[in-house]
A protein has these predicted regions:
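Non-catalytic cap/lid and distal C-terminal segments of serine-dependent acyl enzymes
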Residues: 1-165
Length: 165
């Protein structure tokens, strides 16, 4: 019952925002960092037509392809690996793609890069010919400094797309 992040982001938070702020709910984008980046990617691709753009900073890209990710997916979703597919952004990108633009940033010195598996998402984006950018930022790790350095780019990316809608 607790920690239903998909519903929190797509229903609860959206309801609060739409009821309390003058927001055009027809123009939405989604972004996140690390596990939140993974969530942004899977939610964005899992809800075609809802989001105009997705961006992620150092996202988990292929949890089904790493032992630690498989352990987490099994704990949350059970042992049936078919249930895991909709929670793997690389597989979703390859199979479904996204109907808007995508921006991904990851640091070349990210200490978790082997667990994040960004090459799988980059490959899926290339194979799918996904509209967007996948950027490797030289010298950056997974830290707050990385996020604070590039988050403005992500906000501008979304603002440009939403304002030119």
């Amino acid at each position: 019952n607790n920690f239903q992040m998909w519903d929190y982001i797509t229903v609860d938070l959206t309801d609060v925002l739409s009821k309390n702020f003058n927001i055009d709910m027809a123009r939405q984008s989604i972004m996140g960092h690390s596990m939140g980046g993974h969530g942004a990617l899977t939610i964005g691709m899992g809800m075609p037509g809802r989001f105009k753009s997705i961006s992620a900073l150092a996202p988990i890209c292929n949890p089904t392809g790493a032992d630690w990710g498989r352990k987490q997916l099994a704990a949350y979703l059970g042992d049936d690996e078919q249930n895991w597919v909709k929670h793997d952004s690389s597989i979703l990108m390859l199979n479904e793609g996204f109907d808007g633009k995508v921006l991904i940033d990851i640091g070349s010195k990210d200490q978790f890069i082997d667990l994040l598996r960004p090459e799988t998402l980059a490959s899926a984006m290339t194979e799918r010919r996904q509209s967007g950018e996948f950027r490797i930022q030289s010298g950056y790790d997974h830290s707050y400094f990385f996020v604070s350095t590039f988050v403005d780019d992500h906000v501008a990316f979304h603002a440009d797309l939403l304002n030119n809608e």
